[in-house]
Amino acid sequence: MADDVDQQQTTNTVEEPLDLIRLSLDERIYVKMRNDRELRGRLHAYDQHLNMILGDVEETVTTIEIDEETYEEIYKSTKRNIPMLFVRGDGVVLVAPPLRVG
């Protein structure tokens, strides 16, 4: 019985960086990518290179344009939904686990 408790504590603890991602399997996560891309989706699989398979993904791409008259920066966001997406790990900047309330 004590072994079961120890095993459960080991599976829910974060000792290495990839443990945080392991605990987020089958949960919704936020992924910030290079080139001002952001992804929100359900994590189905990942590997040590941060290659990931995400489902029910909402991709947001932010572009900056400069107004020729006022030289002000104009931010534009484009969103699209993707049912299943393979994310190559070398473009990943940040992975945030789901918000846990409680």
Curated annotation (Swiss-Prot):
Q: Does the keyword Ribonucleoprotein apply?
A: yes
Q: Where in the cell is it found?
A: Nucleus
Cited InterPro entries: Lsm3 (IPR034105), LSM_dom_sf (IPR010920), Sm (IPR047575), Sm-like_LSM3 (IPR040002), Sm_dom_euk/arc (IPR001163)
Q: Which UniProt keywords apply?
A: Acetylation, mRNA processing, mRNA splicing, Nucleus, Ribonucleoprotein, RNA-binding, Spliceosome
Q: Which PROSITE patterns match?
A: SM
SMART domains attached here? Sm
Functionally, this protein is described as follows: Plays a role in pre-mRNA splicing as component of the U4/U6-U5 tri-snRNP complex that is involved in spliceosome assembly, and as component of the precatalytic spliceosome (spliceosome B complex). The heptameric LSM2-8 complex binds specifically to the 3'-terminal U-tract of U6 snRNA.
Q: Which Pfam families match?
A: LSM
Keyword Nucleus listed? The answer is yes
**Gene Ontology molecular functions:** RNA binding; U6 snRNA 3'-end binding
State how it assembles: Component of the precatalytic spliceosome (spliceosome B complex). Component of the U4/U6-U5 tri-snRNP complex, a building block of the precatalytic spliceosome (spliceosome B complex). The U4/U6-U5 tri-snRNP complex is composed of the U4, U6 and U5 snRNAs and at least PRPF3, PRPF4, PRPF6, PRPF8, PRPF31, SNRNP200, TXNL4A, SNRNP40, SNRPB, SNRPD1, SNRPD2, SNRPD3, SNRPE, SNRPF, SNRPG, DDX23, CD2BP2, PPIH, SNU13, EFTUD2, SART1 and USP39, plus LSM2, LSM3, LSM4, LSM5, LSM6, LSM7 and LSM8.
This protein's major location comes to nucleus
Organism per entry? Homo sapiens (Human)
Q: Which GO terms describe its biological process?
A: mRNA processing; mRNA splicing, via spliceosome; P-body assembly
Q: Which GO terms describe its cellular component?
A: catalytic step 2 spliceosome; cytosol; Lsm1-7-Pat1 complex; Lsm2-8 complex; nucleoplasm; nucleus; P-body; precatalytic spliceosome
Family under the similarity heading: Belongs to the snRNP Sm proteins family.
Query: Per its UniProt entry, which superkingdom is the organism in?
Result: Eukaryota
Q: Which residues carry this modification: N-acetylalanine?
A: A2
| Protein name per UniProt | U6 snRNA-associated Sm-like protein LSm3
Q: What is the lineage of its organism?
A: Eukaryota, Metazoa, Chordata, Craniata, Vertebrata
Sm domain ranges (all copies): 16-101
